[in-house]
Amino acid sequence: MVKFEESVKNKEISGVLGQDYVKKQLKSAILMRRHVVLVGPPGIGKTTLVRSLVNLLPEVDVSGEMVKPPFVRVQGSPDLTSEDLIGDIDPSKAIKYGPMSPSAFTPGKIFKADKGILFFDEINRCSEKLQNTLLQVLEEKKATIGSYEIDFDANFILIGTMNPEESSTEPLSDVFLDRFDMIYMKPPESLAIEKEIILSKNINLVKFPDKLLSNTIGFIRKLRNSSDLEKHPSVRATIGIYERAQSNAYLDSKDVVDVKHVQDAIISVLSHRIRLKPSLKYVKTTTEFLREEFNQGFNDDLADNGDSP
């Protein structure tokens, strides 16, 4: 049987290019079975990265059989209830076994994640009641269910994600956050890595010239650093323009993307993915801002100056 520590150390986190520092931090936390919240803007691969973490873990013994450890996802939402996480009484089983019998209990997602990973996406949308529900489980790796006198095992690693730009339904309490390590994830480190991410999508409807693609990515990265914006475009925006520019060229019966095809995609792809600062949004619209930035800044220098995240 492969030891837990050896498995985590020797296996690679796949599916996300770059982010070497974040990957090492995640491995370090998982090695000690610590709970983690991965913090970063949308569209940078947080979910993909978390999904790949279960591959670090060795097989686990379930009823005498060696199987892959479970990976259970919970989507943060104001509608999420304690019963979704912990479980509830099944009426039909309660009739058969009695309402106080553990056999009448249908386990929730935290028990399904036992010996594996519980992925809590958008954990900053977790209500105070749910935070309190999780406190015992995170600390003791067990949960006491209602009036039952039995503690149920819930030995999982919780990996949460959150977007710092979005408000939570209720602030995460200091007591709750004290159960986690925080790891901060940023957009791709360089233009070259971002280009590699884009090309890995294998979308080749028409030819996208390499220099034009570099300039397109450089333009997005320039917006990502803009002091005029309080919400910046993610890698999803880059992928969107890459795809839509090809579509525009194809609809024009062209075999090669040109600048006009990129320009025609800018407003549709970017206008809702950025937000102007209050000092600017009363002076110009988002559409006007994007057109000005494109006309003034889309040039050959972008490919050389796009290495800041």
PLM features: what roles do these ranges have?
Residues 79-113:
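Short glycine-rich substrate-engagement loop in P-loop NTPases that contacts/grips substrate
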Residues 171-187:
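A short helix-turn-beta junction within AAA+ P-loop NTPase domains corresponding to the substrate/partner-engaging
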Residues 42-43, 48-51, 251-309:
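C-terminal engagement/docking regions of AAA+ P-loop ATPases
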Residues 4-44:
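Pre-Walker A (pre-P-loop) alpha-helix and adjacent loop at the N terminus of AAA/AAA+ ATPase modules
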Residues 27-77:
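Walker A/P-loop
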Residues 16-18, 37-42, 61-66, 97-110, ...:
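Conserved Walker
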Residues 32, 221-229, 239-257, 268-276:
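AAA+ ATPase "lid" subdomain C-terminal helix
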Residues 119-120, 156-163, 245:
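Structural recognition of the conserved hydrophobic beta-strand(s) that form the central parallel beta-sheet
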